[in-house]
From Swiss-Prot:
GO terms for cellular component: plasma membrane. Coiled coil: none annotated. The keyword NAD does not apply. This is Phosphatidylglycerol--prolipoprotein diacylglyceryl transferase. It is a multi-pass membrane protein. A 1,2-diacyl-sn-glycero-3-phospho-(1'-sn-glycerol) binds at residue 142. Catalyzes the transfer of the diacylglyceryl group from phosphatidylglycerol to the sulfhydryl group of the N-terminal cysteine of a prolipoprotein, the first step in the formation of mature lipoproteins. Pfam families: LGT (PF01790). Belongs to the Lgt family. Its main location: membrane. It comes from Acidiphilium cryptum (strain JF-5). The chain crosses the membrane at residues 17-37, 59-79, 94-114, 132-152, 177-197, 208-225, 235-255. Keywords: Cell inner membrane, Cell membrane, Membrane, Transferase, Transmembrane, Transmembrane helix. It is found in: Cell inner membrane.
Amino acid sequence: MKNVYVWPHFDPILVRFGPFAIHYYALAYITALVLGWRLMRRLVREAPVVATHEQVDDFLSWATLGVVLGGRLGYILFYQPVYFLDHLNRTYAVWDGGMSFHGGMLGVAVAILIYCRRHGIDPWRFGDRVAVPVPIGLFLGRIANFVNGELWGRPAPAWFPFRMIYPESGSDVPRYPSELIEATLEGLVLFIVLLIASRNERIRSQPGYLGGMFVMGYGIARTTAECFRQPDWFLGYLMFGLTMGQLLSIPMIVIGATMIWRAKYVARRQGALATA
């Protein structure tokens, strides 16, 4: 068969130290946090100045907690609540995968609100700066999914230029490499769009605009990418033939658009007051 490749059976563990091991999945999270921290230190000092470097350093631990707790709780509540009620001892096994981006996003949003309230920072502007580096983590996370041979795609038509057989799927049917498609849409493309937008001082000056772009952009990217991804076997297709990922992402498009509208409205109102 032309344009068909076999998933190369990567070892999900990068390095072993006796009883300890570093998984690619964990490495993706750590790398994303470090790169995001570095980028955010630069973003918060660009006009209008939002926070200090020290506050960004301090927030890193809050963001980590929000991602891990929110991501895990989101996966449990959105995807497998019944399973984890019967297997409470598996609740903490994050090294085996099972993290929800939507849950992680909510966890970080809560962390932003609490941290900004404690330190007198505008949460809208701070959230804008947090939003820009997030696609880095999405990109690396999807690459880790590919390395783990999980979240494979739906059967792909013969004309698709890069089909892949996943032995772990239990069949030799060529599929979409959905992890790589998601890495491209949710990660690479969204990051480029946000990075370019963040260079525009007019956009940066509208609190909530960049955050709205991220929320709406992710909603569009994830909803589109889910069309190539095989639904979770324990959920399948849900109402209207949509997947859980799509049901969680479609509202994000509306929420993100509303955030952008609000940002423009607030900016116009502040401009009118300044000239009054």
